[in-house]
Amino acid sequence: MRRKNIIGQNIRKDRKNAGMTQMELAAQLQLLGVKIDRSTIAKIELGLRPLSDIEVIAIARALKTPVLSLLGESETLFNQWIERNE
């Protein structure tokens, strides 16, 4: 199964819904003590850079969205993968 980066896609969606640029999100993360710059956010949104749990929580806080909103359908995709590989 080809991996899909649901979190990156959802960060982009939630960031745009919040009316924030990548630069503004990076600035909010800096205020929270998380050093992620604009180019790193671009890589995250494109699925080119994985996230730590702390980074996911910080991004959710900066976007004022629940962590589960960022995870989206990740659990559903995982369960489908498990079923296919049993």
Residue ranges and their predicted role:
Residues R61, S69-E86:
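Short, charged recognition helix plus adjacent turn
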Residues Q9-Q30:
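Short basic helix-loop element that most often maps to the first helix and adjoining turn
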